[in-house]
Amino acid sequence: LLTYAFVVFNLMYPGADFAGSIFGFAGFGLSLPEGWDSSNYNAGYTYFTDFIFQAMFAATAATIVSGAVAERIKLGPFITFSLLYVGICYPIVGMWKWGGGFLNELSTPFYDFAGSTIVHSVGGWGALVGAYLLGPRIGKYTPQGMKAIPGHNLPMATIGVFLLWFGWFGFNGGSVLSADPGSVSRVFVTTSLAAAAGAIGALIVSFLKFKTYDITMVLNGILAGLVGITAGADQMGVLDSVIIGFIGGGLIVFSVVFFDKIQIDDPVGAISVHLVGGIWGTLAVGIFGNLAGWGQLYSQLLGVAAVGLFCFATSWLIFFSLKRTTGIRVHENEETEGLDINEHSMRAYPDFASKD
């Protein structure tokens, strides 16, 4: 939040002087353009509500990475990565569209209503690079095959996903940037339908593939539906949102299997949900809804490619530099014992700890 306040906000929204460009900067700190009134910044919101809302989006991009590198990354290097990635990569990408940059000035402007690419794919690319350079958790992949390492509390994970679903009403609904009941209610409906359809898509595909009802796939299917609808939540109809969510949920199953096959260990499926789901949702804007068309699809492809190349290169540079200097992975003994006691000198679940 502090980084976003002092550097990132004015890097992401540098002003009209940088329209159509790939980079701009309006100075450090929070400061209104000359002559503007903070209480009348825009018809639907103020300067400071805009700041705090967008700051939460930036935080989201960083937290996406944490899931893919869980249980083996050093805390210090991860904090360093988060500061640099959110401080440099995220605002530059955001400026390309939301700050009036080159993606917004295409003949058919790139469209990303609430961040399938600008938030979720940005986090997903960082997650992919981080998981690859860290390597898998101890015992995840053996000569005998892949070993499942289940989460410690599936009911809590389920509650967490439903809390995320509820939070998405603020994520997508807030992106209307006004309290207009017609627009906000439409976004609420498309968001919820996509989430529900994502659950069904993941349930059906996982059952056909594994012959069991895999609740973890269903939970990630919900999230994939939410990520997928985020790019065009204000442009989709009822059937559009159901199709986008259903396909997104089904894609998750194949994506999780694919990344396990190439031995990229992602404990929570963050890469599949946010990167794969974000790409799908961004492309879906050119296929479904009010903006569908070849010109829009081309712009969406261009946006996905530009953001992907920049984010991959930036996250690789940061993670690789940290790996060569401070190191990014904890010692094998620390990983086996658990990061809570070694990084924080305390345990999350002391009643279940060894009494040696």
Q: PLM ranges: what are they?
A:
Residues 1-356:
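Hydrophobic alpha-helical transmembrane bundles of multi-pass membrane proteins
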